[in-house]
């Protein structure tokens, strides 16, 4: 098909291809992608930890992370169906921190809905929901809708706060109004009524205590909870935060 293209069209194809593949001109990138040493299809066979670490200030090579996740989901889904009868023997949990900075994972809106049945889950960590919408456009709502749980750790991004405020709904409060008139004909009155009030206003959410979080689980009303104190974890002593050596 390339050879059938007109001269100018063929040149445009070459220029576009060269621009997209430019990172592979770097020898280190070619070395990393020359052969497979990750064995992604084995992650669901036994307990394994795989760390994918990229620069949080330079997005040049973030596409590599996106490629890895795409291959990971495809390989594990195929293995779950073809080898294990639909479910991996060991649950694979993907903790995708700074999910907005790794580039777009193709068909993520479909994957998050289908990988769960194969014992695979994805946890997207974002600074704000608007980041997800900036990358996945209209599919962002589908991705969020397919998440069984959502945790708000705090923030001040207006769109996120407004959507959380609406999701929390309202509570019913009792109000009592009293009136007292003094003078020649004193009188006293009391009025009682029920009113609807936002469970948490946008204002209140923006100043959420740093030690608190709001958890939304499917089928359960949202609730406020304490954040887990990592320093109390039995393995905290093995982390670099505890031991600077």
Model-predicted segments: where are they?
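P-loop NTPase motor domains
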Residues: 1-120, 135, 203-227, 231-245
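P-loop NTPase motor core of the ASCE superfamily
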Residues: 47-48, 110-113, 131-245
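H-loop/switch region of ABC-family ATPase nucleotide-binding domains
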Residues: 126
